[in-house]
């Protein structure tokens, strides 16, 4: 029997399940555990290869007949918001974001629960309890933060009402947005878009070149918003390809 080093990741393949993005397709995922002293280093390496993190698991699609899921990362240092994106920034100028330690709160869960009920009531996360939420935030062996967005108080400082939050990993070369959510009662603010814009600005100020947005699927309305943040890179079999306003993918 082969003895594997505890530092050598072991990969597993899930059984096929219905794809949540493309009707009539089946999805499978390859995954491994992120534990131990090398978890952060492994998470960085796997993220560069198109994996995503969920708690102490790193996964990526491994579907038999489909390669539609494409990993996307925004080039933070070159990003310039379009006119419409500048409007989103202006609309949310009264919000203050603070990057905090990954500690769950009842206030966060209240927003999270309302967001799921309004946006994803039939999804795989619909039944998450407060304990499930706490696990999502705390079960991490990598550098994870939660960015809270609150209304600015009369004094101009943070401390007002929480309206959104983003669970975020800090990688060696960027910020990876693990999961973000917002108060559905202020849907007109485009808070999902605003949080991405804020993360791009944060990455730039931290000297990090990229913001990882997860998977983009061409033709999927659920994923189309990710194509708005240009220039970006998309992972292909030949490595990361640059996509700018022309929509043409080129080797960077």
From Swiss-Prot:
Q: Where in the cell is it found?
A: Cytoplasm
Asked if Acyltransferase is a keyword of the record, the answer is yes
Q: EC number(s) of the enzyme?
A: 2.3.2.29
Q: Which InterPro entries match?
A: Acyl_CoA_acyltransferase, Asp_Glu_LeuTrfase, N-end_Aminoacyl_Trfase, N-end_Aminoacyl_Trfase_C, N-end_Aminoacyl_Trfase_N
Q: Read off the SUPFAM superfamilies from this record.
A: Acyl-CoA N-acyltransferases (Nat) (SSF55729)
Q: Which GO terms describe its molecular function?
A: arginyl-tRNA--protein transferase activity; leucyl-tRNA--protein transferase activity
One GO process term, biological-process aspect: ubiquitin-dependent protein catabolic process via the N-end rule pathway
Pfam families this protein is in? ATE_C, ATE_N
Which GO cellular component terms, listed alphabetically, does the Swiss-Prot or TrEMBL entry include? cytoplasm
Catalyzed reactions: N-terminal L-glutamyl-[protein] + L-leucyl-tRNA(Leu) = N-terminal L-leucyl-L-glutamyl-[protein] + tRNA(Leu) + H(+); N-terminal L-aspartyl-[protein] + L-leucyl-tRNA(Leu) = N-terminal L-leucyl-L-aspartyl-[protein] + tRNA(Leu) + H(+)
Keywords of the record, alphabetical order, are: Acyltransferase, Cytoplasm, Transferase
Task performed by this protein:
Functions in the N-end rule pathway of protein degradation where it conjugates Leu from its aminoacyl-tRNA to the N-termini of proteins containing an N-terminal aspartate or glutamate.
Family indicated by similarity: Belongs to the R-transferase family. Bpt subfamily.
Protein name per its UniProtKB record: Aspartate/glutamate leucyltransferase
Q: What organism, scientifically named, is this protein from?
A: Afipia carboxidovorans (strain ATCC 49405 / DSM 1227 / KCTC 32145 / OM5)
Q: Which gene encodes it?
A: bpt
């Amino acid at each position: 029997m082969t003895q594997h080093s505890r530092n050598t990741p072991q990969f597993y393949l899930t059984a096929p399940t219905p794809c949540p993005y493309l009707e009539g397709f089946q999805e499978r995922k390859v995954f491994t555990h992120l534990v131990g002293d090398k978890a952060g280093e492994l998470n960085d390496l796997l993220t560069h290869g198109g994996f995503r993190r969920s708690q102490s698991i790193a996964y990526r699609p491994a579907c038999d007949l489909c390669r539609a899921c494409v990993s996307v990362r925004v080039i933070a240092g070159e990003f310039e918001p379009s006119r419409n994106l500048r409007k989103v920034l202006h609309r949310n100028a009264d919000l203050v974001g603070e990057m905090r330690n990954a500690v769950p709160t009842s206030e966060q869960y209240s927003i999270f629960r309302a967001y799921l009920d309004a946006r994803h009531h039939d999804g795989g996360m619909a039944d998450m309890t407060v304990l499930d939420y706490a696990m999502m935030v705390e079960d991490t062996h990598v550098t994870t933060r939660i960015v809270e967005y609150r209304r600015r108080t009369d004094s101009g400082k943070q401390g007002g009402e929480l309206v959104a939050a983003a669970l975020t990993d800090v990688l060696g070369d960027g910020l990876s947005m693990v999961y973000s959510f917002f108060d559905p009662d202020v849907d007109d603010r485009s808070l999902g878009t605003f949080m991405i814009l804020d993360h791009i600005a944060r990455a730039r100020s931290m000297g990090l070149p990229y913001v990882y947005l997860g998977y983009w699927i061409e033709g999927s309305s659920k994923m189309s918003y990710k194509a708005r943040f240009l220039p970006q890179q998309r992972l292909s079999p030949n490595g990361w390809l640059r996509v700018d306003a022309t929509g043409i993918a080129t080797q960077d």
